[in-house]
Amino acid sequence: MNLKNTIKEDIQDALIKIAIINCDPVITLNKKTKIGHYQLNNLIKIANISNLKPFELANRIILNIKKKYMYKEITFSQPGFINFLINPYWISEQLEKIFLSPRLGINHVNAQNIVIDYSSPNIAKEMHIGHLRSTIIGDVMARILDFLGHNVIRANHIGDWGTQFGMLIAYLEVKKLVNSPLSLMKLEEYYCKAKKKYDIDQLFAEKSREYVVKLQNGDQYCYSIWKKLVSITMLENCKIYKRLHVTLKKKHTMGESIYNKMLPNIIEDLKNKKIAIEKNGSTIVFLKEFKNRLGEPMGVVIQKKDKGFLYSTTDIACLKYRYQVLHADRIIYYTDSRQHQHLLQAWTIAKKALYISQNLLLEHHIFGMMLSKDKRPFKTRDGDTIKLSALLDEATERAMRLIKNKQPNLSKKKLNQLSNIIGVGAVKYADLSKNRNTNYIFDWNEMLSFEGNTAPYIQYAYTRIVSILKKSNMPIKKLKEKIFLTKESEINLAIKILEFEEIILLISQKGTPHILCKYLYHLATSFSHFYENCSILFPKKIKTCKSRLKLSILTAKTLKKGLNMLGIRVVKKM
């Protein structure tokens, strides 16, 4: 049930009846719930367009919609607001529908093919904290769009091609390590050594470039080593994905190498279409849409003098593939803000070449950095980048210490399971609860707190409801009486439950999980107020008990579903 949309449509219908069209009513939650649960916020702006005083316009709108069953009362307040008090009986009817719905009353939308490009680590390197935001924010979007009925194509655009593989293969050859046991940790160590050698040893650099050419030309020996490197890396990455409880699997890997065979044809085609030209041995596209420091059209190199391809070339091919082969209607990229201009340039070239439709929805959902308390990039004490596995290990250990203090007699198996769910959930929620467009301060104490907008607080709210339901000893099938709402805290909780669909639809458009986190926190606090003000298990009447149990069940279902969309698990006991 999308309450905001319903109110908005009612207002638009009322405006049309008084010959006011093309207006966009802005509906917000009202902080003063006693006079209205929702509020029309831009009445003055609409009144100015219609040459009416706000009070006159408000009266006309109210006259047209006040008889609708949904509203208990509609009032005007100065200087220019309309307040909508929702009818508790109408709210109860909506809750009954949701109670019987496995999807909490949320319908499927018209399906689109949506590619979500996220995580995208590099081969031969361990995942680090820089990969966390892309991985978990992208995964929330994938889960939500899946739930709404879209055909979601998860694309893990791994860096599995390029000069670094020539370096690594050459190093493994020189050091006679090709047939030795290799781990991802060792591969990263060898890559660092290979890079240093490449920068100072001309013969080694030449050999590395030869291996790159061989690999690009399909040399079987180089290809077998490359495949081994990819396999070792992805095996470890998939372990991280499993620990993070994200939906990325090995089958979602769509690395840069997929597009390698397309690149020569794309260069030729862009030349033939006069989009690209050769200059000083390189192939360049000059884009008037982008200016260099001198105010001239910016040049985007798509092939180097040595005939090597660049990231821009790969991204153009990738776009063509996603549109023409995967039939994407919408493509969402989760990379940091530094990639923004690069992506815009690739999109512009792909459109000029008619590789993609002008109507294809292309979105770059940028995100900020994770910072330490001194507002610097979050690193180890030695200044190294923190590995994601180490971060999750510490989260689990810290959660374990907290749980041991609260439940010292817990079995080792239960302790490990609970520590993992709470620790990893806390890290994810701390990140997801911040606006992705901004940097945020990483704080262990804050994220593992059982107070405030944290995962443990919301997980605990869920377990508390489970405990209440268990104490009631009332099977769900016996809860046949209708929900009825009399107290303010009941009504406020009910309206918060109805708000869930609106939140999910908003995130599906904007890709901002912090809105869902904020909603779940407010839902949990609304339940807390309800619990404090209304006896659930021991009211005067049994029908009141059953009604409040149903309201509690709906809250628990919504909390669980919301956390699931964030990729965070619930527990029945904390």
From Swiss-Prot:
Assigned EC number: 6.1.1.19
Swiss-Prot/TrEMBL catalytic activity: tRNA(Arg) + L-arginine + ATP = L-arginyl-tRNA(Arg) + AMP + diphosphate
Cell compartment(s), UniProt: Cytoplasm
UniProt GO MF annotations: arginine-tRNA ligase activity; ATP binding
One GO location term (cellular component): cytoplasm
Pfam families per record: Arg_tRNA_synt_N, DALR_1, tRNA-synt_1d
Enzyme class, UniProt record, top EC level: ligase
BP GO annotations: arginyl-tRNA aminoacylation
Motif 'HIGH' region, residue range(s) on this chain: 121-131
SUPFAM superfamilies, A to Z: Anticodon-binding domain of a subclass of class I aminoacyl-tRNA synthetases, Arginyl-tRNA synthetase (ArgRS), N-terminal 'additional' domain, Nucleotidylyl transferase
UniProt entry keywords in alphabetical sequence: Aminoacyl-tRNA synthetase, ATP-binding, Cytoplasm, Ligase, Nucleotide-binding, Protein biosynthesis
Top-level lineage group: Bacteria
HAMAP family: Arg_tRNA_synth
Stated family: Belongs to the class-I aminoacyl-tRNA synthetase family.
Subunit structure, as described in the record: Monomer.
Classification via PANTHER family: ARGININE--TRNA LIGASE, CYTOPLASMIC, ARGINYL-TRNA SYNTHETASE
Protein name: Arginine--tRNA ligase
Originating organism: Buchnera aphidicola subsp. Acyrthosiphon pisum (strain APS)
Phylogenetic placement of the source organism: Bacteria, Pseudomonadati, Pseudomonadota, Gammaproteobacteria, Enterobacterales
